[in-house]
Amino acid sequence: MKFLFSVILVIISFLGISKIVNGQIACPSPFLYRATNDTVGDYDLGYQYINIGKPLPPQLSFLNNCLMPCQSSFFEQDSWNSFNKLVKQMGAVAFTCSAIIMIIYGPLMNRSFFKFDRHTITVFCFALSTFFIGVSDLMFATNDVDMVCPESHRYARQTDKTCATNGVLFQFGWLGSVMWFAFLSIDGFFRASGKKMNKIAFAIVLASIWILNIVLSFAPMGGDQYGAYFVGQVNCWILVKNWQYAFFWAELIVSLAIGFVGICLTIYSLIRKTSDGNTLKHVTPLILVFLLFCQYLYMIIFYGIINEKKDHYQNILAEQVGCIFNNALAKMKVPGIVYAGECTFNETITFSSQYAFLFFVRLLGIEIFAFYLFSKETLLLIKSSYIATMFGLGDKDAYDVELEETD
């Protein structure tokens, strides 16, 4: 962690920096001292202490009251700038891509939408979900870091401006994409095998997914769970890992299981129909579902590691800062302080793993666009759309005829 080397330079430049600066207790830059006896209450307000995690000599006891900066010291500022830039730029692209697919597959252009066409509605719902992720990213782009860091050393909480809204939008979009990915895999199997689904059954599935998504997105507000996490996310999201497991990761695990079954059944159906001239057109959606499966799998592995090792990562950072200051005070011959030897710098979260996580979440909206925009199905939807037929450029039955022939 290169950040810690900058701490060393600060210490050296100030000859070990005293804990008293102009009569005020000071912490090493970029940390900030906060006098408190209620660290738990402060956490609820958004303050994150470095938490040395072990008894300290009196001369160093002030370090337990040092606040972590927002955004956190797990990454250098250049790294955070890269993360923020990725979310802003890629989020805007994903928002636009999702909106285009929503328009084509939604009721504005899709004549089959209100006929409860299973496939087009499923694609629309997935695009709608990634659209909400894009909206949350645009909120971050508009408000910048102030949305997650209302103060230099305080992380946003649900009571802060825009954080609750951003958290709900992100959760709603991300969770929705997960559940509709699962159904997209089942839809692929139905299309590849030629099986049909009762429209009433599909209506029940449609309503159930959206109702469940709404409940799981708004319920965390009852526990004041939305806020800025000091690692993993750039947006506001669910703070406590047990709440994350209950309201997101459990649903993702179930969706991955369904997705895996759907992928296997689709492959099996395609193998059985290798002589069918329509087999190739089912391969592209299968590739999309497989890529989504891999991305969601990476997300759960990454966040699982983060959640399980969060306290460990904090302790590494805290111990390294404590070691540096201990040695600095020892060199100043402060009574009672013993030189602790060379301070080691252990890796916590790599830049590439964090970047990949943020990238994969934003890639969802771009993928649905890339895989469906130029498909034959999309071209038929455009040809049969209200707008195309209004100007005499299309055939209102084009998509339905294709559907009858192949589905």
From Swiss-Prot:
Where in the chain are disulfide-linked cysteines found? none
Positions bearing carbohydrate: 37, 346
Subcellular compartments:
Membrane
Q: Which residues form the signal peptide?
A: 1-23
The keyword S-adenosyl-L-methionine belongs to this UniProt entry's keyword annotation: no
**Keyword list, A-Z:** Coiled coil, Glycoprotein, Membrane, Receptor, Signal, Transmembrane, Transmembrane helix
Q: What is its main location?
A: membrane
This chain is encoded by the gene named fscJ
Q: Which organism is it from?
A: Dictyostelium discoideum (Social amoeba)
Q: State the name under which the record lists this protein.
A: Frizzled/smoothened-like sans CRD protein J
Q: Which family does it belong to?
A: Belongs to the G-protein coupled receptor Fz/Smo family.
